[in-house]
Amino acid sequence: MTTMFAFLHHLCAFTLVSALAIEFTLIRQELTLASARRLLMTDMVYGIAAGALLVVGLSRVFFFEKGAEYYFHSHAFLTKLSLFIVVGLLSIIPTMEFLSWRGAVRASQVPAIDAKKMRRVTAVIHGELFAIVIILLCAAIMARGGWV
């Protein structure tokens, strides 16, 4: 069972990173009806992957692996968890923007977004990607038993 949860954890993490990379690519292009639809769908996949990653990850902490006591005394784990929460909170900004496009997309229109909002969404996605790189570093440190 431990192996299955490790597999699910990695699957969710890779799905989350892939979805965010797709968002990063799409948001840098000219916004079209097709790209707006893709962003809405990709952001939904991103949200589902993030929720599943949190559930599977916490299940591993509390029911499998080394136990909650070990993890909650690990600075690398606490940093990783904190950054995951920060990324989750940051992701609300692009998600709210993308969701505001639903009406236009349903009407087969390209959503209107001003340059300032687009820069903000792009900057947030950059920040999320940077935080995920640090999360991966923390995961590698944890795997080696470091920074306890």
Model regions: which residues?
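Polytopic transmembrane helical bundles with strong interfacial aromatic enrichment
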Residues: 1-148
